[in-house]
């Protein structure tokens, strides 16, 4: 699989991912681009799961963004509806992490759209490691979003055999800050 992480901090949002493509227990490619810019570079998207499935979802998601003039949440919900109702899409095995200047969302293979706590997303085989690392860095450092995403991916890559250290990082200016959790 892979690891994708998204962090929002100090008016920046980042989605970063590793580049490993595995077939069973064999590394087939180490420099795949699993993070992309969509809709006139205003939306970031990263995928975890089957590569062909993810490209199909990228195309569908981008068409939904076009249809809804770049409205991220509306496009995500419409894609999720299609994913649930379309027999061909239902068989796709992938997760999407998407973000624009105001929102960060996870679109699941079950057709769910989730807005994560604190605008922190970590998906894929190394997602739990990346999420734990990013959470600790968000709570205990002043690092920026890009540094946190890169460090979280490095930690996931050190632990998860399906995650490597070849990263693609995309960044946008953000107009919102995640809520600080109550003590």
Swiss-Prot record:
The record's annotation in Gene3D superfamilies points to: Glutamine Phosphoribosylpyrophosphate, subunit 1, domain 1
Name the enzyme group at the top EC level: hydrolase
Major location category of this protein: cytoplasm
Q: What is its EC number?
A: 3.4.25.2
Q: List the subcellular locations.
A: Cytoplasm
From what superkingdom does this record's organism come? Bacteria
For whether the record's keyword set contains Hydrolase, the answer is yes
Reactions mediated catalytically: ATP-dependent cleavage of peptide bonds with broad specificity
The catalytic site is made up of: 2
The regulatory note on its activity is: Allosterically activated by HslU binding.
Instruction: Please name the InterPro entries in this protein's record.
Output: ATP-dep_Prtase_HsIV_su (IPR022281), Ntn_hydrolases_N (IPR029055), Proteasome_sua/b (IPR001353), Proteasome_suB-type (IPR023333)
Which Gene Ontology BP annotations are present?
proteolysis involved in protein catabolic process
| GO-annotated cellular components | HslUV protease complex; proteasome core complex
- One Pfam family from the record: Proteasome
Q: Which UniProt keywords apply?
A: Allosteric enzyme, Cytoplasm, Hydrolase, Metal-binding, Protease, Sodium, Threonine protease
Q: What does the record give under GO molecular function?
A: metal ion binding; threonine-type endopeptidase activity
Residues holding Na(+): 157, 160, 163
Protein purpose: Protease subunit of a proteasome-like degradation complex believed to be a general protein degrading machinery.
The family this protein is said to belong to: Belongs to the peptidase T1B family. HslV subfamily.
Assembly notes: A double ring-shaped homohexamer of HslV is capped on each side by a ring-shaped HslU homohexamer. The assembly of the HslU/HslV complex is dependent on binding of ATP.
Q: Which NCBIfam families match?
A: ATP_dep_HslV (TIGR03692), PRK05456.1 (NF003964)
- Record's protein name: ATP-dependent protease subunit HslV
Q: Which organism is it from?
A: Vibrio parahaemolyticus serotype O3:K6 (strain RIMD 2210633)
Lineage, opening ranks? Bacteria, Pseudomonadati, Pseudomonadota, Gammaproteobacteria, Vibrionales
């Amino acid at each position: 699989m892979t690891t994708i992480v998204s962090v929002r901090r100090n008016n920046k949002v980042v989605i970063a991912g590793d580049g490993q493509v595995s077939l069973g227990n064999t590394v087939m490619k180490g420099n795949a681009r699993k993070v992309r810019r969509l809709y006139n570079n205003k939306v970031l998207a990263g995928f975890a799961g089957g590569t062909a499935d993810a490209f199909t979802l990228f195309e569908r998601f981008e068409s939904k963004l076009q249809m809804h003039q770049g409205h991220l949440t509306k496009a995500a919900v419409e894609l999720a509806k299609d994913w649930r109702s379309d027999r061909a899409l239902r068989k796709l095995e992938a997760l999407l992490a998407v973000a624009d200047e105001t929102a960060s969302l996870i679109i699941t293979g079950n057709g769910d759209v989730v807005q994560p706590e604190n605008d922190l997303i970590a998906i894929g085989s190394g997602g739990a490691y990346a999420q734990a690392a990013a959470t600790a860095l968000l709570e205990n450092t002043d690092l920026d979003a890009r540094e946190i995403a890169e460090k979280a991916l490095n930690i996931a890559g050190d632990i998860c055999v399906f995650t490597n250290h070849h990263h693609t990082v995309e960044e946008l200016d953000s107009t919102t800050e995640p809520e600080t959790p109550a003590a």
